[in-house]
């Protein structure tokens, strides 16, 4: 076997369906569309979600809730990530977090969450902190500074 005689595995490919090419093909005349009706016409068919005139599901169900236009979206970082990456005494700010791949896109700022343990004294600068994160940072001898 070489590159000049490679063939697809048996049964892995199908011949394409040539429609409207005479009665002997099995798909001549109406080309598999049947007789008349909306689906036989060019551009025929119903739009997605159309239920034949019955009130569609989307309109039968009640509206619920809303999306706040003023919602703040923070990039989240946990203390366990800071523990693994940063050395004791270092300053953790937006640039340091970005260089180490902990945040990629910042919309409304960075929030530090308290998941994991911290035993290094770090100076952490962020837009928001959870209460548990502040407690753990200060217990380890570090500082939590709000930007």
From Swiss-Prot:
Gene3D superfamilies: 3.100.10.10
One annotated GO molecular function: structural constituent of ribosome
rRNA-binding as UniProt keyword: yes
Stored Pfam families: Ribosomal_L27A
SUPFAM superfamilies registered for this protein in UniProt: Ribosomal proteins L15p and L18e (SSF52080)
Keyword RNA-binding: yes
Compositionally biased intervals (Gly residues): 21-31, 42-52
Region of interest (Disordered), residue spans: 1-62
Covalent S-S links between cysteines: none
GO biological process, one term: translation
Keyword annotations from UniProtKB, A to Z: Ribonucleoprotein, Ribosomal protein, RNA-binding, rRNA-binding
A Gene Ontology term for the protein's cellular component: cytosolic large ribosomal subunit
InterPro entries membership: Ribosomal_uL15, Ribosomal_uL15/eL18, Ribosomal_uL15/eL18_sf, Ribosomal_uL15_bac-type, Ribosomal_uL15_CS
Family per similarity comment: Belongs to the universal ribosomal protein uL15 family.
Quaternary organization: Part of the 50S ribosomal subunit.
Protein function: Binds to the 23S rRNA.
Protein name: Large ribosomal subunit protein uL15
Organism: Syntrophotalea carbinolica (strain DSM 2380 / NBRC 103641 / GraBd1)
Gene name for this UniProt entry: rplO
């Amino acid at each position: 076997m070489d590159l000049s005689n490679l063939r697809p595995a048996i049964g892995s490919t199908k011949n394409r369906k040539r429609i409207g090419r005479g009665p002997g093909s099995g798909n001549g005349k109406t080309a598999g569309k049947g007789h008349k009706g909306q689906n036989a016409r060019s551009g025929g068919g119903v739009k997605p979600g159309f239920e034949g005139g019955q009130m569609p599901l989307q309109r039968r169900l009640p509206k619920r809730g809303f999306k706040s236009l003023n919602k703040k979206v923070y990039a989240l970082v946990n203390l366990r990530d800071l523990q693994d990456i940063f050395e004791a005494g270092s300053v953790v700010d937006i640039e340091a977090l970005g260089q180490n791949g902990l945040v990629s896109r910042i919309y409304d700022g960075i929030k530090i969450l308290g998941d994991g343990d911290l035993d290094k004294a770090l100076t952490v600068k962020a837009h928001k902190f959870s209460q548990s994160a502040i407690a753990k940072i200060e217990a380890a001898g570090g500082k939590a500074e709000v930007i």
